[in-house]
Curated annotation (Swiss-Prot):
Sites where the protein binds tRNA: Y18, F69, N71, N117
Gene3D superfamilies in alphabetical order: Peptidyl-tRNA hydrolase
Subunit structure: Monomer.
Site feature location: Stabilizes the basic form of H active site to accept a proton: D96
Protein name: Peptidyl-tRNA hydrolase
Site (Discriminates between blocked and unblocked aminoacyl-tRNA): N13
Entry's Gene Ontology cellular component terms: cytoplasm
Subcellular location: Cytoplasm
Organism: Vibrio vulnificus (strain YJ016)
Active-site annotation: H23 (proton acceptor)
Any Gene Ontology biological process: protein quality control for misfolded or incompletely synthesized proteins
EC numbers, comma separated: 3.1.1.29
Homology family: Belongs to the PTH family.
Keyword Cytoplasm among record annotations: yes
Length: 196
């Protein structure tokens, strides 16, 4: 059974100084999908972000990387969703995940924000609807909560970045499966993947 996903969002902080930081892992998924489909994301002020449109398995999918700061991501998502009449249940948000190690990613539907400011604002701006899909890109944890801010805004060492890149690539392939064959088939594949 195919899955109706109409909007894929990659959470990020804007600007070149943040582009390669762990907190921007969600945006890497959208950038890779745009690259694979040979489109250029365009800045759209009314949606507070970089946007694009692709067709996957005959289904239109809008792409968004908010250019607000992370803690205001919901403003961009809500603006685009409202304009195109996209329901929260038709949105997939890709984001960095401290609770998964680098090299691992997981799909999830619904749930809380787990302390992630981008997810927190998204839930709030979608009227506290938590039923959107998430693509959680593992970045690992620094070991202590006081180190989290510096960790997510830091760049991964090369050995770790190669795991993140491989995970993003596999996530894009599994997104294709999700749209064509549904969540459980996509989970079956992505959740057994581990970048080496």
């Amino acid at each position: 059974m195919s899955q109706q996903i109409k909007l894929l969002v990659g959470l990020a902080n804007p600007g070149p100084e943040y582009a390669k930081t762990r907190h921007n892992a969600g945006a890497w998924v959208v950038e890779e999908l745009a690259r694979v489909h040979n489109i250029t994301l365009k800045n759209e002020a009314k949606f507070y972000g970089l946007t694009g449109r692709i067709v996957m398995n005959g289904q239109e999918l809008r792409l968004l990387i908010p250019t607000t700061f992370m803690n205001l991501s919901g403003k961009a998502i809500a603006a685009l969703a409202k304009f195109y009449q996209i329901q929260p249940e038709e949105i997939m948000v890709a984001h960095d995940e401290l609770d998964l190690p680098p090299g691992i990613a997981k799909f999830k539907k619904g749930g809380g924000h787990g302390g992630h400011n981008g997810l927190r604002d998204t839930i709030s701006k979608l009227g506290n609807n938590k039923e959107f899909y998430r693509l959680r890109i593992g970045i690992g944890h620094p070991g202590h909560k006081d180190k989290v801010a510096g960790f997510v805004l830091g760049k991964a060492p090369a050995s770790e970045q190669s795991l993140l890149d491989a995970t993003v690539d596999e996530s894009v392939r599994c997104l294709d499966i999700l749209i064509k064959d549904g969540l459980s088939k996509a989970q079956n594949r992505l959740h057994t993947f581990k970048a080496e």
